Amino acid sequence: MERRLFTSESVSEGHPDKVADQISDAILDAMLEKDPNSHVACETIVTTGMVFVFGEISTNAYVDIQDVVRKTILRIGYDRPELGFDGNNCAVMVDIDEQSPDIAGGVDHSLETRENESDQDELDQIGAGDQGLMFGFAIKETPELMPLPISLAHRLMRRVASLRKDHTLDWLRPDAKAQVTVEYDENNNPLRVDTVVISTQTDAEVSNKEIRRAMIDLVIKEVIPARYLDEKTKFLINPSGRFVIGGPKGDSGLTGRKIIVDTYGGYARHGGGAFSGKDSTKVDRSASYAARYVAKNIVAAGLAYRCEVQLAYAIGVAHPVSIMIDTAGTGKVDDDLLTEAVRHVFDLRPAGIIKMLDLRRPIYEQTAAYGHFGRTDVDLSWEKTDKTQDLLDYIKNNK
């Protein structure tokens, strides 16, 4: 097998699509803080001088949405007019409806409880908020069990943001993107980094030479382990030649447009559903988190080198319609036995996921930039590996 290249990208918190994601999740968190049972589907558009928040929300909480929007924008770093977008004076428009009663009926009273009125299992009460398929993935390429390309891309973006916020590089602006191409050997092990692309918004005065030096010396070489860099590694720094106009002034942003950045950088499959702005009754989000939790525990238990999990749901139904485990031939036991173990160890009904991962908390804004998985900078319940022994015990007793 020939060596191959694989590329993943990340974007900064100041990227317009990520600004929208963070606003949607900040609103979700504000709702959950006051009413943990809020049903939220919140979308955001950002463009030059304007934010538009819309969607369907059912809650007992009162939240000053305009205030949440402005505080989020200012936290990201758009805090003065010369950046082309300013949380202090941008227009904020809000158009929120209540959740459809047809959807709410299926969520609050699952098909299982409607067909069997004597069903007293509280975890059967909540039906999935929609149909759909969700994937989770884990692989032993990094300590956090993530693919190396997306892991490095996220770390590059966090480093650029850190240098901006601590004023080490005062000429940096909030918008940025990174892309990392990794070369794999014939056994699919990471061999080296072939190409690094960083495009970062700057002020107009800094020279391209200074930008390049800073990105290579203070970002790339600080983030990417030296063993992956060699004399053939290519560094493409602001290759367009100029990146001064950025953020929502340069491009409009919309919630849910960076779903590959949010997950595994294209290394694993994706069901198509976005995460931000959605409460945990939306299986697009909660089941994707659960699938990652399952996959990570399988790999952490030493049961496979890599693992992809697919879950699928029907609207208004509590139990998943399918569970699939695929270890791509790296499993220590048969994938069918792993699937049995997963059904035994993990409760993958929506209410079971919510309880297992404690998802009614205001924890989501921190996930809306730099990825939802493999995070080492925040504490996320779906990143824990506390089910490994349960999996091993089931496998041992059922071989």
Curated annotation (Swiss-Prot):
Residues 99-109 are annotated as: Flexible loop. One of its GO terms (molecular function) is methionine adenosyltransferase activity. Keywords: ATP-binding, Cytoplasm, Magnesium, Metal-binding, Nucleotide-binding, One-carbon metabolism, Potassium, Transferase. L-methionine binds at residues 56, 99, 251, 282. Mg(2+) binds at residue 17. Binds 2 divalent ions per subunit. Binds 1 potassium ion per subunit. Its cofactor is Mg(2+); K(+). SUPFAM superfamilies: S-adenosylmethionine synthetase. Gene3D superfamilies: 3.30.300.10. Homotetramer; dimer of dimers. This is S-adenosylmethionine synthase. It comes from Lactobacillus helveticus (strain DPC 4571).
